[in-house]
A protein has these predicted regions:
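Residue-level marker of alpha-helix boundaries and capping positions
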Residues: 9, 90-91, 176, 208
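Glycine-centered short loops/turns at secondary-structure junctions
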Residues: 26, 193-195, 225
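N-terminal Rossmann-like FAD-binding beta1-loop-alpha1 element of flavoenzymes
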Residues: 4-31, 175, 181-191
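Glycine-rich flavin
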Residues: 2-3, 20-27, 32-169, 202-206, ...
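Internal, well-ordered alpha-helical segments in soluble enzyme and binding-protein domains
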Residues: 181, 185, 213, 217, ...
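Rossmann-like NAD(P)H-binding beta-loop-alpha module
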Residues: 156, 167-201, 208-209
Length: 256
């Protein structure tokens, strides 16, 4: 049995902030992580998304300059595999600098690789070892909530995590939902040449935001070329030889 002052479940930004503060106050800390050190932000969230979005923005700007006579930039092209490779290198570097090296710099912080299970209020089982903490911090974060659309479980769907791990760019993509992550991903893939359709069940995208702002953003994205369908409900999802078919219903019509 190993005993610590503080035991923290997972190792994302919140977990590390808690671990460092506890160590600075003189506590011994154990962080339990079943997957990759660093959590969502550095591995599959903020860092990789902003890196790829910045690349898409730059490519979009270069392509837009073609409408000016007298400006020549050669044949701009997207090498998706190389973009993904440099994104992964950035993630690996930041994970090491901002998380692994930081933890190793504190003698009071230990990282236990494995899945933790509570066996009492202060005892957690990790890899058949019991870890005890006077205080336990649960910093497990969140994961994508998969809607129960008929047929969805039988198709090869993506979450935002898998979207950034694609080995090749798809010809087309349907994004269900019109929230912030859906829009930034949709615009990014569109700028890389993917035909993107966004399905939003509400009357406009960004349903939790000011309507005037949301509609302005919707107009901008549609002018850029994204296909956005609002007041649209998904009724069925199915796999086909050419990809995934999504059947939808709107107030006016039903279509695939």
């Amino acid at each position: 049995m190993s005993a610590y002052d503080v035991v923290i479940l997972r190792s994302g930004s919140a977990a590390f902030a808690g671990a460092i503060k506890a160590a600075e106050l003189g506590a011994t800390v154990a962080m339990i992580e079943a997957e990759i050190i660093g959590g969502t932000c550095v591995n599959v969230g903020c860092i990789p998304s902003k890196n790829m979005i910045a690349a898409a923005d730059l490519y979009h700007s270069v392509m837009g300059m073609q409408r000016y006579r007298g400006l020549s930039f050669g044949a701009a092209q997207v090498e998706w595999a190389s973009l993904v490779e440099q994104k992964e290198e950035l993630v690996l570097n930041l994970r090491k600098k901002k998380y692994l090296d930081l933890a190793e710099g504190h003698e009071a912080i230990s990282i236990l690789q494995g899945k933790g299970h509570f066996i009492s209020l202060q005892q957690i089982l990790v890899n058949e070892e019991v870890v005890t903490g006077r205080q336990v911090l649960i910093a497990t974060g969140t994961r994508a909530c998969i809607p129960a659309f008929p047929g969805l479980e039988s198709v090869s769907y993506l979450t935002s995590t898998e979207a950034f791990m694609l080995k090749t760019l798809p010809v087309s993509m349907i994004i269900i939902g019109g929230g912030v992550i859906a829009l930034e991903l949709g615009q990014m893939f569109h700028r890389f040449g993917v035909h993107v359709t966004i399905l939003e069940r509400g009357p406009h995208i960004l349903s939790g935001f000011d309507e005037e702002v949301a509609r302005s953003i919707q107009n901008i994205l549609q002018d850029e070329g994204l296909n956005i369908l609002t007041s649209t409900t998904v009724t069925e999802v199915s796999q086909s030889d050419t990809g995934v078919t999504v059947r939808v219903h709107t107030h006016q019509w039903s279509n695939r």
